[in-house]
């Protein structure tokens, strides 16, 4: 699946930078084009993989390259006023060659949080390709302003985007990890998950069974319908499993002779369970939330893609979620020494983390100033019954 990727703000730019590094290192070629947008010159200069001519500085006359200081209303205003500058770079993308846009932003900051729904709305007005978002939730200890920014940005972005994938920093930072090191590790982990998910939709069917391989339409159909999504991931190194001394030809022979074995089936079903019940990007208990659609992707060497295991894993996910719209398939990676599983849940309602975010944001908004707002039933199902207490960004 080919993506036009847009990083918005500091965190969005860094994640797109990490995704480009992953794309180049693994040759998965999911990033057809990438650009980043920011109001801070220093953040743009710190990037390593995004080309210099694809780094767009906006708000020069308003903030002079110094950023918006966490003010996402100002971020949204500047993005709206300077949307033509962003479009000049988007015009260099061969949009007819991509399957979707992916916008990436931290929801708690200023530039990315404000720009996400603005750019999403703009792209949907101009193009027929789906426009997806990846929104990073702030940590709960970052304070009420960040939660308010995130709640308002999320509420607006859900309305403007075709789907919003959520990543919760709190669920993925390791204890005693430095802030810089923690976010760098998170960005690499995110890039891997996105690489497996969207890479699965860009496979040469000449090297894979067309009955089981996942294509771009499967991913698009899973994300169709809007709302928010979460992504689970688990992997198993084949060298670790077989022992270092059994790697190479002997390891491959053993795998080929047991493609349909109970061991191959159990490996996949175990990974599906770990991906589903482990660290989802938006932490939820699948049995305790409403899920509209889902997708199970198993990636690895073709001789390890056990059909029985994939089907059993997909069926187990159906049973756990109560959702009957769970797709399943494989992603052949001939040179890989790892079997990995990605589980995508889309159209989620009732997530405790989002209700908590809305509650903190509402409290911060009430404390800061008296506001009025509105919301529709769809937003209430995502953010909770009190979603109308929050103002959208526009």
Swiss-Prot record:
Q: What is its main location?
A: cytoplasm
Pfam families on file = CetZ_C, Tubulin
A single Gene Ontology CC annotation of this entry is: microtubule
SMART domains associated with the record = Tubulin
* CDD domains, sorted: CetZ_tubulin-like
Q: What happens when the gene is disrupted?
A: Does not affect motility. No differences in growth rate or cell size.
UniProt GO BP: cell division; microtubule-based process; regulation of cell shape
Mention one GO molecular function.
GTP binding
Keywords, comma-separated and alphabetical: Cell shape, Cytoplasm, GTP-binding, Nucleotide-binding, Plasmid
Compartments where located: Cytoplasm
**Cross-referenced InterPro entries, in alphabetical order?**
CetZ, CetZ_C, FtsZ/CetZ, Tubulin/FtsZ-like_C, Tubulin/FtsZ_GTPase_sf, Tubulin_CS, Tubulin_FtsZ_GTPase
Q: Which residues bind GTP?
A: 10-14, 110-112, 142, 169, 187
Describe the task this protein carries out: Involved in cell shape control.
* Similarity comment: Belongs to the CetZ family.
Give the protein name, as stated in the record.
Tubulin-like protein CetZ4
Task: List the source organism.
Answer: Haloferax volcanii (strain ATCC 29605 / DSM 3757 / JCM 8879 / NBRC 14742 / NCIMB 2012 / VKM B-1768 / DS2)
Gene from which this protein is expressed: cetZ4
């Amino acid at each position: 699946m080919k993506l036009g990727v847009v990083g918005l703000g500091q965190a969005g730019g860094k994640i797109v930078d990490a995704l480009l590094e992953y794309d180049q290192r693994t040759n998965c070629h999911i990033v057809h084009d990438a650009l980043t947008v920011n109001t801070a010159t220093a953040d743009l200069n710190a990037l390593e993989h995004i080309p210099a001519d694809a780094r767009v500085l906006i708000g020069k006359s308003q903030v002079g390259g110094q950023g918006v200081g966490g003010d996402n209303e100002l971020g949204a205003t500047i993005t709206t006023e300077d949307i033509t500058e962003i479009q000049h770079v988007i015009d260099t993308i061969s949009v007819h060659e991509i399957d979707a846009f992916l916008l990436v932003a931290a929801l708690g900051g200023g530039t990315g949080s404000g720009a996400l729904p603005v750019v999403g709305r703009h792209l949907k007005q101009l193009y027929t390709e789906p426009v997806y978002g990846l929104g990073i939730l702030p940590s709960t200890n970052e304070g009420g302003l960040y939660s308010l920014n995130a709640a308002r940005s999320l509420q607006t972005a859900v309305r403007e985007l075709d789907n919003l994938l959520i990543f919760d920093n709190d669920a993925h930072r390791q204890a005693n990890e430095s802030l810089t090191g923690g976010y760098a590790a998170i960005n690499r982990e995110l890039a891997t998950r996105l690489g497996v998910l969207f890479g699965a939709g860009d496979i040469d069917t000449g090297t894979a069974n067309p009955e089981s391989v996942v294509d771009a339409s499967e991913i698009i159909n899973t994300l169709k319908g809007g709302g928010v999504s979460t992504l689970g991931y688990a992997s198993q190194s084949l060298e670790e499993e077989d022992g270092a001394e059994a790697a190479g030809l002997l390891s491959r022979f053993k795998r080929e002779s047991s493609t349909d074995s109970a061991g191959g089936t159990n490996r996949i079903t175990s990974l599906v369970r770990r991906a589903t019940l482990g660290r989802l990007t938006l932490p939820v208990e699948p049995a305790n939330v409403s899920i509209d659609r889902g997708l199970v992707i198993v990636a690895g060497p073709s001789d390890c893609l056990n059909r029985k295991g994939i089907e059993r894993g997909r069926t187990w996910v159906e049973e756990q979620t109560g959702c009957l719209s769970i797709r399943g398939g494989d992603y052949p990676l001939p040179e890989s020494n790892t079997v990995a599983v990605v589980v995508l849940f889309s159209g989620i309602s009732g997530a405790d983390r989002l209700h908590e975010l809305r509650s903190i944001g509402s409290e911060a908004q009430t404390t800061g100033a008296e506001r009025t707002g509105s919301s529709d039933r769809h937003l209430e199902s995502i953010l909770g019954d009190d979603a109308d207490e929050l103002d959208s960004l526009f």
